[in-house]
Regions:
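Residues forming the flavin
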Residues: 2-54, 58-149, 153, 157-170, ...
Length: 535
């Protein structure tokens, strides 16, 4: 007999299967000897009160043995000789699109500007060691995309539960722990995810697909408003090419701020209401904050308990930071993005203007180099479309200047920031390239710094001990999502003016994390299959 139960137990019971069996036997009147195994289907922590509980949904196998695998297998057959589909980018959107195309009997050919996930690791080490950034292989570009070496966090707010479960099961099929199927906030870990990504690539190749690394798509070949192919490794900038050649794009809202790092013990003490921290049976504590400050959202983003802050620049003259956590979340620090919502209209008001005249001239020159026939009116329109991107680039450059023109990051103690004081020293940090004390409140746009300060003060009121000089703000967090969207039809998922082009995933402006990008990749693969079947 197989029975499912909802349980509310202490952490030490949830962490030990034998104790869980004993609890089940006592609470449900079962014979302990007849409970052969238990499987946790859902798990979440209730830390609202001083006594912490773990909510479980479990499956008990009574006088039966459990099935061997805890996840559902997807069958991938050979697609040798099948119609070919070019997939640009080997991030989660591209990888899941490719796997879904194979399911649908189509042959994916992936082109990826960066290196494979193993070779990429060497370039990441150079950023911290030598302060040099390879524009083609870094924390943003390469196999696995930005998520491969950031955190491996698989939480999404997507309401398409079936699609989310499919994504998690595919990860398990390729080597991820089945625990991700149960956890409320599933997490693979940046130490485990590269192997999973490598296995996904191997499945694609074994089925007859192709994966080409160090192959950057720079332009599209378009005839009569229909895509015919791509140009690679030409040196052009792709978004600039799209804008200059009339392929419809649009500015979208972004969120910009800092990485905030606390001692992990302090966050554990706050969240678990215990001066001794999390103890033996609880994971490093998470938090989530959101508030409104002068009409714009201020919120935590991609919180990494027991994690590290890493340099995420993708080119020269940039300092960008991101967070990551290993699977055990065992670091001495916990960090999170703390960002302010920015809408496209905020740039029009002029309050967010950072752009220098020299930079504006360079941007116009780049567009004219791609398309010399652009009029002043067209240049003005393109500038509006690309303004969030250019703002992001200029803020990252300012951060590089403030950091001493290296990957050293400008930083300020949290309480000092709210009091507009320069920090005379900084706490120890997980950020390996190093920190330099800097008045973030002074050089960051007032639109951002003012709202961050108000947000921090609000978070400090609701979570005693959170607003503290033990915490350090590290600049800047700018890559929460793409600042530009390649516009597609809501029903067909095809570009609004170019037939056969299906913008997909985070880079195209349609996702905000690993799982949402994977879900979007599968949806776009299905849309491509429908398009091909109608030809």
């Amino acid at each position: 007999m197989i029975q499912e139960y909802q349980l509310r137990v202490l952490p030490e019971i949830a962490a030990n299967e034998q104790r869980l069996k004993e609890y089940l036997s006592e609470e449900k009147g079962l014979n302990l000897r007849n409970i052969n195994a238990t499987r946790i289907l859902k798990r979440s922590i209730d830390a609202r009160q001083r006594t912490i509980f773990v909510n479980l949904k479990i499956r008990a196998y009574i006088n039966e043995m459990p099935e061997e695998d805890e996840y559902e297998h997807t069958v991938y057959n050979s697609v040798e000789g099948k119609p070919q589909v070019i997939v640009v980018g080997a991030g989660p959107g591209g990888l899941f699109a490719a796997l879904r195309l194979i399911e649908l009997g189509l042959r994916p050919v992936i082109v990826e500007r960066g290196k494979d996930v193993r070779e990429r690791k060497k370039d990441l080490a150079q950023i911290s060691r030598e302060h040099t950034v390879n524009p083609e292989s870094n924390y943003s570009f390469g196999e696995g995309g930005a998520g491969a070496y950031s955190d491996g966090k698989l939480y999404t707010r997507s309401k398409k539960r079936g699609n989310v479960d499919k994504i998690l099961n595919v990860f398990c099929q390729h080597g991820a722990s089945a625990a991700i199927l149960a956890d409320a906030h599933p997490h693979i870990g940046t130490d485990k995810l590269p192997r999973v990504i490598e296995n996904m690539r191997n499945t694609i190749i074994e089925c007859g697909g192709e994966v080409h690394f160090q192959t950057r798509m720079d332009a599209l070949i378009i005839e009569n408003n229909e895509i015919k192919g791509i140009e690679t490794n030409t040196g052009k900038t792709f978004l600039g090419w799209l804008a200059a050649n009339g392929v419809t794009i649009e500015a979208k809202g972004i969120a910009v701020g800092v990485r905030l790092e606390h001692p992990a013990m302090l966050i554990d003490q706050i969240q678990y209401h215990n001066k001794n921290g999390r103890g033996k049976y609880l994971p490093a504590a998470e938090y989530s904050f959101v508030t409104q400050a002068e009409g714009r959202g201020v919120y935590s983003f991609c919180m990494c308990p027991g994690g590290f802050i890493v340099p995420a620049a993708s080119g020269p003259e940039q300092v960008v930071v991101n967070g990551m956590s290993p699977s055990n979340r065992g670091s001495r620090w916990s960090n999170s993005g703390m960002v302010v919502e920015i809408q496209p209209e905020d740039f029009i008001s002029g309050e967010l203007k950072m752009e220098s005249g020299e930079l504006a001239a360079q941007q116009n020159a780049q567009l004219l180099a791609i398309n010399p026939l652009l009029s002043n009116s067209q240049l003005s329109t393109l500038k509006t479309q690309l303004t969030p991107l250019h703002f992001q680039e200029e803020l990252e450059r300012q951060c590089w200047l403030q950091g001493g023109r290296r990957q050293t990051a400008p930083a300020q103690r949290m309480l000092d920031f709210t009091r507009k004081k320069l920090s005379f020293d900084l706490p120890e940090s997980s950020y390996r390239p190093g920190l330099i004390s800097s008045p973030l409140h002074f050089w960051m746009p007032d639109f951002i710094s003012k709202r961050l300060s108000l947000g921090f003060q609000q978070f400090g009121r609701t979570s005693h001990g959170f607003l503290t000089n033990e915490a350090v703000m590290i600049g800047v967090e700018t890559r929460t999502s793409s600042p530009v969207r390649i516009v597609r039809d809501k029903e067909t998922l095809q570009h609004v003016t170019v037939r056969g082009l299906f913008p997909c995933g985070e880079g195209a402006g349609y996702a905000g994390g690993i799982v949402s990008a994977g879900v979007d990749g599968e949806r776009c693969a299905e849309a491509v299959a429908n398009y091909i079947n109608q030809q």
